[in-house]
Amino acid sequence: EMTRDLRKIARKYPGKTGLSSLGRTYDNREIWCLRVGNPSAAKKLVIDAAIHAREWKNTQVIMRQTEEILREYGEHRARFRSTCLYILPMDNPDGVTISQYGASGIRNAKLRKKIQKIGHFNTWKNNARGVNINNNFPAGFSADKKKDKKKGKKRKPDATTYTGKKAASEKETKALISFIKRISPKTVLNLHSTGSILYWDFDVSSPLHEKQYRLASEIKKRNHYRMMPKSSSTEEHGGFADWLVYEKKI
């Protein structure tokens, strides 16, 4: 349904949008990217959703917002000459399928069998290999592995917490990394569900810290979300945001 809607949008607004795939998942689903605006613009903004499978409601939100933006495109034509939006409505399409339909939604027999053994579909966050994509990025990943080893923890594929054998082991992670490196965006907004909070302070030095504070403050003015303290933003590593901040300085 999302793929159909994206193609419909791209056909309806051919001069304003561009639809492309960042790659395919383990169950052969596309990771779609919809460009809105001038691809040569100096300012590039990425908005992504559903990196955690059970948070697929954000996909519906981002799709609706995209349609609203395009309907009002004419009023902001000058802005879109200098700014380009890249909409990633579903980072984890395999996981979303599992969250919505259980193991039966997965077409690959080997993957489906492993997923059936894991269960917990109503709380499923991970991809089709039972890996949490949002803890699979190369930013503090090895440090967390060392902590687990010290505590004697042996993790394996599951519905919510498994981070993978190594950093960037997953197709979805690699696709996101490759995409960010290719377009070098100024800002990335990573949408999640529940909490009504903003994770923004990753204990980095200025001017990046000041930029993050300004952006979070502007968002707070509009949605009244609570800005979380530094300690809450640095408890876990290997996240998409961790990698964006520490490795790409975004």
Language-model regions: role of each:
Residues 33-35:
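Short, well-ordered beta-strand micro-motif
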Residues 42-43, 56-202, 208:
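Active-site/substrate-binding loop(s) of hydrolase catalytic cores
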